[in-house]
Amino acid sequence: MGSEISKKDITRLGFRSSLLQASFNYERMQAGGFTWAMLPILKKIYKDDKPGLSAAMKDNLEFINTHPNLVGFLMGLLISMEEKGENRDTIKGLKVALFGPIAGIGDAIFWFTLLPIMAGICSSFASQGNLLGPILFFAVYLLIFFLRVGWTHVGYSVGVKAIDKVRENSQMIARSATILGITVIGGLIASYVHINVVTSFAIDNTHSVALQQDFFDKVFPNILPMAYTLLMYYFLRVKKAHPVLLIGVTFVLSIVCSAFGIL
């Protein structure tokens, strides 16, 4: 492997990251755009090593949902590790471990703080007929957009400097990243998978027990989303079922159960 990644390559990566959500879907979220953005540099790193390139692309095509303005930092970090030939499990583990926290940080800074504050200030200007309002908001938004290039360079720089430490502690990092990754996935299950059983049982003429609210949620909150996710994982991993088939089955089950008053 071995290649020379230039600043121009990293800058290009930063701009390509702007299309992170161009192929957004609910199976892999941003995986398509993430892989597309990194592909030119991955080709430069792996050159004629098609199995290596295939493995890298396969890892990058796995589920990812992170903040579009900060994704460049993660891309730069992963590229620096790819360039140094780090273990695939370590690279994959760090990606899984970091995309969730990066999403949380980005949402807190940009969507929930900076942009709402700027929107309030600029709306005040605009309501008074001041042209500065829309111009200022647009300028801030553009600044945030172009900062993704800077974040990409920061991620690449940090990755290169930290690579020796990663090599020395790769097994520990991989294990820690795996544990953190599983924790993140658990949070994603609770956030994205919703099953609400409305079925209830009458005890007498005036009292009834709601199956989910009075039983499942009291014993183990979110047990149904977790159970259904594990069932889908079983069909995907063990039975090798096609994801589209499972999505279709889930869609049909939702309609049928809703029609019969179960969900």
UniProtKB/Swiss-Prot annotation:
<feature type="transmembrane region" description="Helical">
    <location>
        <begin position="98"/>
        <end position="118"/>
    </location>
</feature>
<dbReference type="InterPro" id="IPR050303">
    <property type="entry name" value="GatZ_KbaZ_carbometab"/>
</dbReference>
<keyword id="KW-0813">Transport</keyword>
<feature type="transmembrane region" description="Helical">
    <location>
        <begin position="131"/>
        <end position="151"/>
    </location>
</feature>
<dbReference type="Pfam" id="PF03613">
    <property type="entry name" value="EIID-AGA"/>
</dbReference>
<comment type="function">
    <text>The phosphoenolpyruvate-dependent sugar phosphotransferase system (PTS), a major carbohydrate active -transport system, catalyzes the phosphorylation of incoming sugar substrates concomitant with their translocation across the cell membrane. This system is involved in N-acetylgalactosamine transport.</text>
</comment>
<keyword id="KW-0472">Membrane</keyword>
<keyword id="KW-1133">Transmembrane helix</keyword>
<keyword id="KW-0762">Sugar transport</keyword>
<dbReference type="InterPro" id="IPR004704">
    <property type="entry name" value="PTS_IID_man"/>
</dbReference>
<keyword id="KW-0598">Phosphotransferase system</keyword>
<dbReference type="GO" id="GO:0005886">
    <property type="term" value="C:plasma membrane"/>
</dbReference>
<keyword id="KW-0812">Transmembrane</keyword>
<feature type="transmembrane region" description="Helical">
    <location>
        <begin position="243"/>
        <end position="263"/>
    </location>
</feature>
<feature type="transmembrane region" description="Helical">
    <location>
        <begin position="215"/>
        <end position="235"/>
    </location>
</feature>
<feature type="domain" description="PTS EIID">
    <location>
        <begin position="3"/>
        <end position="263"/>
    </location>
</feature>
<keyword id="KW-1003">Cell membrane</keyword>
<dbReference type="GO" id="GO:0009401">
    <property type="term" value="P:phosphoenolpyruvate-dependent sugar phosphotransferase system"/>
</dbReference>
<protein>
    <recommendedName>
        <fullName>N-acetylgalactosamine permease IID component</fullName>
    </recommendedName>
</protein>
<feature type="transmembrane region" description="Helical">
    <location>
        <begin position="61"/>
        <end position="81"/>
    </location>
</feature>
<feature type="transmembrane region" description="Helical">
    <location>
        <begin position="178"/>
        <end position="198"/>
    </location>
</feature>
<keyword id="KW-0997">Cell inner membrane</keyword>
